[in-house]
């Protein structure tokens, strides 16, 4: 398969088979006082021995951890809705995306049904085998839909009905009562609750106080500022992510993440559980093909 991103050919035998990690094997190193071990498809540098005279081999569980990719399929529904009918078929596309290796499917139904419709959500629930994430503003009709469908995860997003896309996270302090109440309703059905927040440790702590299981960091500012300076762009997200870890919250991230900025984000915040990516991935798929694009994004998460 031709990888347009790296301009090279790559042999891929089976997209659905997870990576197998070999037993760590000592590899040569040009750096004195250090040893490299081949683990899976890469190498890990082990510092020089401590006073005990022993080198620590990386924990296999840490080596095997990889941030999950949940693909937002809203843009596929936009194309379908532009002509009427059912082409492309969002359910078939979601099943293919699963087959190509994504660990989850995300949808964001809005009241105006401009892309994903409530009936799409019901149809997807019947067939998906991976994690199903429904995100949106918890208005009464949305809450009723989520309680009916019972997805793996619901992500609460404070978007206005006329917003083109999500543009801010919750003020979890000002909305604590409301978020606590709706979170409890979802928990009664066994649904994991993630709260969409800006990269502010106070908002992360507020989400914990509301009973959330995870937070999703709104990464638009990171993506916008990344070209001017990656470290500066990441700094507030690192602080928020560390607060999530202190609070015992799971960590998701999403909005404008792409092939250029994704690897740096997860390499600096490796405890990110999941990234939700839609717009950029579907745009890339126009050039690279959907199957190849899913694999390209998964490779950035390794």
Where are these regions (language model features)?
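Active-site mouth loops of central-metabolism enzymes
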Residues: 72-90, 133-138, 165-173, 191-198, ...
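C-terminal helical cap(s) of enzyme catalytic domains, especially alpha/beta-barrels
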Residues: 168, 229, 284-302
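Hydrophobic faces of well-ordered beta-strands that scaffold small-molecule active sites
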Residues: 67-73, 105-107, 132-134, 154-156, ...
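Conserved N-terminal beta1-alpha1 strand-loop-helix module at the mouth
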Residues: 63-135, 139-141, 147-151
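Histidine/lysine/aspartate-rich catalytic loop segments that bind and position anionic ligands
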Residues: 192-244
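Catalytic cores of alpha/beta
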Residues: 140-148, 200-209, 257-272
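Alpha-helix-loop-beta-strand connector modules within alpha/beta enzyme cores
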Residues: 114-140, 175-194, 232-252, 297-300
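Glycine-rich phosphate-binding active-site loops on the catalytic face of alpha/beta enzymes
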Residues: 156-163, 214-226, 272-290
């Amino acid at each position: 398969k031709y990888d347009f991103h790296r301009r090279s050919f790559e042999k891929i035998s089976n997209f659905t088979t997870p990576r197998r990690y070999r037993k760590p094997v000592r590899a040569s190193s040009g750096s004195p006082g250090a040893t490299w071990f081949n683990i899976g498809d890469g190498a890990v540098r082990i510092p020089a021995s401590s006073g005990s005279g022993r080198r620590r081999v990386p924990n296999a569980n840490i080596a095997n951890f990889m941030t999950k990719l949940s693909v937002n399929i809203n843009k596929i529904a936009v194309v379908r809705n532009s002509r009427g009918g059912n082409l492309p078929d969002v359910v078939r596309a979601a099943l293919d995306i699963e087959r190509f290796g994504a660990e989850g499917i995300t949808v964001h139904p809005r009241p105006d049904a401009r892309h994903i419709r409530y009936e799409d959500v019901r149809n997807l629930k019947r067939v998906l085998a991976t994690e199903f994430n429904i995100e949106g503003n918890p208005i009464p009709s949305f809450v009723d839909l989520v309680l009916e469908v019972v997805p793996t995860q619901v992500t609460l997003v404070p978007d206005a009905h006329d917003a083109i896309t999500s543009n801010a996270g919750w003020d979890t302090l000002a909305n604590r009562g409301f978020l606590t109440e709706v979170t409890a309703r979802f928990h009664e059905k066994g649904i994991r609750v993630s709260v969409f927040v800006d990269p502010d440790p106070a908002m992360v702590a507020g989400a914990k106080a509301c009973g959330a299981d995870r937070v999703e960091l709104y990464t638009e500012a990171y993506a916008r500022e990344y070209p001017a300076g990656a470290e500066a762009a990441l700094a507030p997200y690192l602080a928020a992510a560390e607060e999530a870890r202190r609070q015992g919250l799971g960590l998701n991230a999403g909005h404008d993440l792409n092939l250029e900025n994704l690897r740096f984000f997860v390499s600096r915040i490796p405890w990110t559980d999941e990234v939700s990516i839609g717009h950029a991935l579907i745009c890339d798929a126009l050039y690279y093909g959907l199957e190849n694009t899913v694999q390209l994004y998964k490779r950035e998460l390794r």
